Amino acid sequence: MFMSDLHSHHVNLRLVTKYRVSAEFPDVPGTPSLLFDERPPLGDGRGPNAAMVLGAAIGDCLSATLMNCLIRAHVDVEALTATVVTRVARNHAGRFRISGIEVELCPTVPPSERAGLERCQVIFQDYCTVTESVREGIRVTVSLTQPASDNGNVGTPVAATENPV
């Protein structure tokens, strides 16, 4: 089933040097840019790479979704931590792929409110936009375009691909 877009989020990326890329978030004014970099030997490791950020996005979404459920259930959350491990392995063609993501959420709630935590444990993941989208597979469309020239010509499309989901 194809979903109609309700929201869209924009990220602008700019090459800084070699494998280092700066990401800006124009939808959130005042947000500092995020620097991505590949681990050595490709990059210098001066920032997280895309696999790390994917893990962080899933961990953040699960944390926020759990908090939303607990708040709605009137559970007093004293603390919440999350640990995410993103595993990378080679596929059958020898190319690196994300082979799994493990998330451990550790909420601290008073013993008297454990029943609310247990109720949320059953349902909260279904409401996590990022995690459930990754689990289902996300349609990704990629286009490769030559930038506009200095004389004002419009960018020239080179190629476009889309994965079937």
Per-region residue spans from a language model:
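Alpha-helical metal-binding/catalytic segments enriched in His/Glu/Asp
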Residues: C61-L62
